[in-house]
């Protein structure tokens, strides 16, 4: 709003007076100049009111210089002075209604002090009203209560509305929502306040409309127009202007005679449109005889009619009762109640169980009587005709007997295993309408007979148990069920008689006869047997007993309980050490020997690996991890010792792994004389510190001489024996015909094999030392040991007359299998470079050949004496007796490739020709080649 300018003038006399006061120091008063402004209410803070600097005649910058400021009169500061612009502005929002209430004019006065002149200026600011408030009622809802019999024209004052604004913005008028019963009239009090009055225009009827809802509106005269409303609820009070009215003028009801006392017959209802005490209706009998009054009971408030005494159709079949209804005033109404009593079937049949034959066996024949019943009804005629029935699903039926008796008989076969007892309900029903019935309940037990054998849950069982189990351990349990009961269902378990490897099954397995738990009586060995088959019998205790069998397969699981067993080289029985030969000319990778081992376990537990555990010359030899082949890792040097000691370990892959070791002695030499010359060095002296060089030389010379002399003697004896043998064989013809191959024991030499000529020497298994057969010589490697030259027992041969021709006919020796032969190129050593078409000749001259033949004879003598550490029975392939006929390599087919013929690259195979009993192909050719070399 624009501020009004100052309308007063400053008098010159006053200015002079002020100056005079200042001069004389006399107190002074403010001048008479007054500055007035006018603003509307609700301005924002900082709104412009007036320009003080202009009205005071001062420049804006002089306001601060002269100390112009507002002097408050104790009221909250509503205005502030802007020293820069010289403008008077609002210090906050100004609410006129809060500041001046209902005053017609609202003025705010304060002074402005000019300090340098010590002069005050009065400021008067008028705050004008705006229409910022609507008329409001103190309550949101107004309740007005009017009696319905009030006459028209009656006035009812209503509370007025309040509007804090003034003037035209204040409350100006009231309006009432349109209706046909009320109008509005506005009255004014002495102070000018207007209030409304509600005027009844037409009479009210509470039964027509009990509550009238009106809306009263109060409006002011501002711009924009504001108004307030209030909901007026007019409640019409009741007046007793209506009489009770029954819902029916006449009530009819038919009731059976056997209704119990207290039964509600019907309820009469009368209504009164009035409310409160005027609408409360009470009921009572009117003009009722005393005899009838005792029969019925009427509730005066609800109108319920009940029987107070038993009704009898034969006594009274019809009642007429008059009921009156009265409200709280003088109005009443009447109605009739007609009650018809009907004859009904009020007696239920009586059912009695005369006899009950329980329990009944489940094998009882059809038609067997299990119960006898009697029925009776006190009613007569149709109401006294009684029929009996049972549920259709029961295996019984009712048969009518004489008079009022019924028999309960078996209609279908009984099975106790399906239903062990029957809860039977017999219902007796009369012919009344509605029919009455009576039920009798009893339980019939079914006795068991032994008609079900025990049954196992499975057709067959199988279980697994690790070997080496604890004795007496529970290994499995079987369970059989018998649907019979008591003794007929008591099951006894047993094992069927059987033998395992000639031993009764009962010595291996036992079973708890009550629980069916099986126990191991022995510790099982997977290597002995893998599986146990048995029959478990379950018998009940009935008479006669019934039983059933089930097969049980017990599989023994292998555990790593067997360490690897080394087949080759076999451990010697005399404590000596086996010797293998490696020529100094051997290239890297030369096959020296092969360690052959087996494991009696299976699967991973029998998977073997080889490794070199210890060597006297590290790095000289290597062992195949999976083959066991001992090969040279590098070329042999002159500085390498003649005797090399190797410790080879064989380990399986079980958990935990088991292992075995073997010590190999490898002789490094290029010729037999060199080997023989140094054989004495294979034995270590008992005490190296006390050994003497001279003693060594003497022993060496003596040993060489002994060996040379022994070889000469053996060679001469061999020549004579061969000549004698040829004569003997020619004279005997086929004397060994009919002797099976299993009667011959192959002598495969001693522990050190040399590449040279060799003769096959075979003994019959029952000949001991007395019988020798020398077939066509073949070429093989021969094992030489120190024991060979020191053997004292001579090889004994009987003359021709002592051959057991009649006991054991001689047959021609079968030619050697070609699988056991290999060419010179396949043999380790320097001879491997020769022509592979013919067998090689490692001895350089006839003398070496003769010497080797003598060694073979000595080896044959050891085999005949049973002192050979490598010789074995027939069919054992030179293995020890432990792996004889009862444990051949057929038992360990996975290790056939590991059987190694010392000194060669050949491995054992099961030739088809040998299995068929036929001579292998190429055998004759080998014999011819051998003969040619002998002639040379």
UniProtKB/Swiss-Prot annotation:
One of its GO terms (biological process) is homophilic cell adhesion via plasma membrane adhesion molecules. Residues 926-936 have a biased composition (Basic residues). Residues 33-137, 138-246, 247-351, 352-456, 457-566, 574-687 form the Cadherin domain. Coiled coil: none annotated. InterPro entries: Cadherin-like_dom (IPR002126), Cadherin-like_sf (IPR015919), Cadherin_C (IPR032455), Cadherin_CBD (IPR031904), Cadherin_CS (IPR020894), Cadherin_N (IPR013164), Protocadherin/Cadherin-CA (IPR050174). Residues 820-845 have a biased composition (Polar residues). Pfam families: Cadherin, Cadherin_2, Cadherin_C_2, Cadherin_tail. GO terms for cellular component: plasma membrane. Residues 801-845, 906-936 are annotated as: Disordered. Residues 718-936 are cytoplasmic. One of its GO terms (molecular function) is calcium ion binding. Keywords: Calcium, Cell adhesion, Cell membrane, Glycoprotein, Membrane, Repeat, Signal, Transmembrane, Transmembrane helix. The chain crosses the membrane at residues 697-717. It is a single-pass type I membrane protein. Glycans are attached at residues 51, 423, 549. PANTHER family: CADHERIN-87A (PTHR24028), PROTOCADHERIN GAMMA-A10 (PTHR24028:SF110). Potential calcium-dependent cell-adhesion protein. May be involved in the establishment and maintenance of specific neuronal connections in the brain. This is Protocadherin gamma-A10. The lineage of its organism: Eukaryota, Metazoa, Chordata, Craniata, Vertebrata. The gene is PCDHGA10.
């Amino acid at each position: 709003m624009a501020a009004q300018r100052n309308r007063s003038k400053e008098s010159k006399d006053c200015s002079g007076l002020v100056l005079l006061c200042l001069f004389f120091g006399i107190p002074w008063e403010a001048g008479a100049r007054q500055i007035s402004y006018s603003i509307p209410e609700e301005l924002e803070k900082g709104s412009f009111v007036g320009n003080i600097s202009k009205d005071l005649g001062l420049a804006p910058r002089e306001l601060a210089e002269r100390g112009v400021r507002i002097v408050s009169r104790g009221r909250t500061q509503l205005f502030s002075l802007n020293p820069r612009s010289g403008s008077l502005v609002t210090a906050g929002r100004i609410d006129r209604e809060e500041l001046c209430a209902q005053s017609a004019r609202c003025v705010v006065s304060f002074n402005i002090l000019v300090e340098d002149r010590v002069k005050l200026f009065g400021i008067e600011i008028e705050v004008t009203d705006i229409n910022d408030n609507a008329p409001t009622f103190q309550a949101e809802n107004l309740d007005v209560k009017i009696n319905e019999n009030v006459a028209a024209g009656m006035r009812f004052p209503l509370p007025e509305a309040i509007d804090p604004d003034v003037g035209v913005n204040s409350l100006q008028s009231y309006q009432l929502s349109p209706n046909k019963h009320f109008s509005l009239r506005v009255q004014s009090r002495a102070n000018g306040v207007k209030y409304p009055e509600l005027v009844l225009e037409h009479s009210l009827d509470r039964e027509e409309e009990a509550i009238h809802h009106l809306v009263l509106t109060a409006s002011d005269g501002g711009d924009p127009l504001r108004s307030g409303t209030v909901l007026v609820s007019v409640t019409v009070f009741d007046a007793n202007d209506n009489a009770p009215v029954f819902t029916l003028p006449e009530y009819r009801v038919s009731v059976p005679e056997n209704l119990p006392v207290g039964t509600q017959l019907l309820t009469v209802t009368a209504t009164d449109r009035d409310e409160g005490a005027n609408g409360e209706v009470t009921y009572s009998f009117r003009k009722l005889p005393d005899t009838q009054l005792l029969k019925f009971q009427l509730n005066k408030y609800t109108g319920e009619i009940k029987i107070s005494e038993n009704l009898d159709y034969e006594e009274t079949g019809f009642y007429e009762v008059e009921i009156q209804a009265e409200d709280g005033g003088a109005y009443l109404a009447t109605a009739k109640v007609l009650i018809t009593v009907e004859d009904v079937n009020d007696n239920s049949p009586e059912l009695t169980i005369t006899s009950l034959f329980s329990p009944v066996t489940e094998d009882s024949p059809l038609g067997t009587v299990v119960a006898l019943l009697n029925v009776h009804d006190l009613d007569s005629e149709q109401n006294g005709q009684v029929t009996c029935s049972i549920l259709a699903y029961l295996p019984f039926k009712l048969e009518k007997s004489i008079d009022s008796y019924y028999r309960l008989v078996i209609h279908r076969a009984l099975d106790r295993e399906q239903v062990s007892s029957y809860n039977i309900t017999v219902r007796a029903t009369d012919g009344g309408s509605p029919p009455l019935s009576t039920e009798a309940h009893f339980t019939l037990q079914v006795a068991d007979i032994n008609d079900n054998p025990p049954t196992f849950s499975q057709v067959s069982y199988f279980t697994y148990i690790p070997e080496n189990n604890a004795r007496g351990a529970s290994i499995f349990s079987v369970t059989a069920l018998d649907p019979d009961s008591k003794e007929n269902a008591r099951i006894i378990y047993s094992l069927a008689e059987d033998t395992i490897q000639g031993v009764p099954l009962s010595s291996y397995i036992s079973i708890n006869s009550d629980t069916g738990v099986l126990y191991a009586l022995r510790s099982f060995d997977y290597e002995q047997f893998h599986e146990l088959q048995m029959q478990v019998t379950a018998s009940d205790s009935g008479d006669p007993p019934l039983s059933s069998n089930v097969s049980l397969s017990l599989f023994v699981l292998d555990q790593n309980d067997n360490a690897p067993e080394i087949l080759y080289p076999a451990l010697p029985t005399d404590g000596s050490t086996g010797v293998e030969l490696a020529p100094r000319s051997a290239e890297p990778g030369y096959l020296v020997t092969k360690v052959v081992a087996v494991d009696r376990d299976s699967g991973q537990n029998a998977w073997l690996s080889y490794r070199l555990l210890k060597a006297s010359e590290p790095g000289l030899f290597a062992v195949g991890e999976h083959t066991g082949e001992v090969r040279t890792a590098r070329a042999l040097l002159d500085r390498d010792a003649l005797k090399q000691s190797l410790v080879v370990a064989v380990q399986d892959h079980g958990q935990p792994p088991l292992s075995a070791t073997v010590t190999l002695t490898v002789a490094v030499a290029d010729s037999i004389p060199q080997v023989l010359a140094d054989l004495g060095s294979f034995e270590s002296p008992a005490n190296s510190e006390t050994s003497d060089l001279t003693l060594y030389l003497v022993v060496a010379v003596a040993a060489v001489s002994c060996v040379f002399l022994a070889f000469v003697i053996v060679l001469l004896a061999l020549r004579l024996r061969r000549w004698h043998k040829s004569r003997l064989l020619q004279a005997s013809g086929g004397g060994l015909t009919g002797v099976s191959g299993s009667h011959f024991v192959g002598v495969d030499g001693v522990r050190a094999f040399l590449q040279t000529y060799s003769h096959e020497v075979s003994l019959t298994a029952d000949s001991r030392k007395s019988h020798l057969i020398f077939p066509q010589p073949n070429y093989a490697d021969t094992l030489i040991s120190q024991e060979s030259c020191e053997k004292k027992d001579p090889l004994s041969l009987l003359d021709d007359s002592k051959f057991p021709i009649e006991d054991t006919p001689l047959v021609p020796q079968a030619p050697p299998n070609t699988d056991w032969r290999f060419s010179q190129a396949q043999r380790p050593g320097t001879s491997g470079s020769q022509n592979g078409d013919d067998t090689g000749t490692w001895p350089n001259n006839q003398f070496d050949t003769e010497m080797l033949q003598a060694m073979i004879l000595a080896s044959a003598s050891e085999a005949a004496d049973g002192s050979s550490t490598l010789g074995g029975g027939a069919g054992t392939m030179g293995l020890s007796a432990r792996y004889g006929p009862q444990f051949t390599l057929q038992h360990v087919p996975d290790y056939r490739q590991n059987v190694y013929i010392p000194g060669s690259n050949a491995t054992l195979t099961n030739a088809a020709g040998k299995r068929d009993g036929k001579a292998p192909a190429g055998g004759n050719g080998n014999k011819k080649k051998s003969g040619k070399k002998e002639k040379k």
